[in-house]
Amino acid sequence: MADLNSPIQYLKDDFKDQTSIGSLEYDENSDTMIPSFAAGLENYEPIPSPTTSSSLYSHLTHNMEKIAEEDDINFLHDTREFTSLVPDEADNKPEDDEESGGAKPKKKKHLFPKLSSHKSK
């Protein structure tokens, strides 16, 4: 038989995403165990059932849309840091063309010189 004088302890999640220890205390006038942190919640209105209320669905939909808008704002940042990595077209022209008159095109360097030496004959 359980000792009704000692509270039952359990872990509960606080509103700040912290875990703390709560306790269940025995109430002699009730058939159920009441959490010690539940005092004063007699006037609390529970969230309506989603099957009986469409307002909950519309509230959740509104929240999802608001989150999506915030995400869009977060991605509309300054993109100059990315575009600066792409060289301008003027930078792609070899400098030797002006000096040599463009008569002889330069040979392209391979990224993998060992692989380029194995050309099919």
From Swiss-Prot:
It comes from African swine fever virus (isolate Pig/Kenya/KEN-50/1950) (ASFV). Interacts with the major capsid protein. Interacts with host IRF3; this interaction interferes with the recruitment of IRF3 to TBK1. GO terms for cellular component: virion component. The modification N-acetylalanine is found at residue 2. This is Protein p14.5. Residues 104-121 have a biased composition (Basic residues). Residues 84-121 are annotated as: Disordered. Belongs to the asfivirus structural protein p14.5 family. One of its GO terms (molecular function) is DNA binding. It is found in: Virion. One of its GO terms (biological process) is symbiont-mediated suppression of host cytoplasmic pattern recognition receptor signaling pathway via inhibition of IRF3 activity. Acetylated. Induction: Expressed in the late phase of the viral replicative cycle. Keywords: Acetylation, DNA-binding, Host-virus interaction, Inhibition of host innate immune response by virus, Inhibition of host IRF3 by virus, Inhibition of host RLR pathway by virus, Late protein, Viral immunoevasion, Virion. Structural protein required for transport of intracellular particles from the assembly sites to the plasma membrane. Binds to both ssDNA and dsDNA. Suppressed the activation of the cGAS/STING pathway by interfering with the recruitment of IRF3 to TBK1, which in turn suppresses IRF3 phosphorylation, decreasing interferon production.
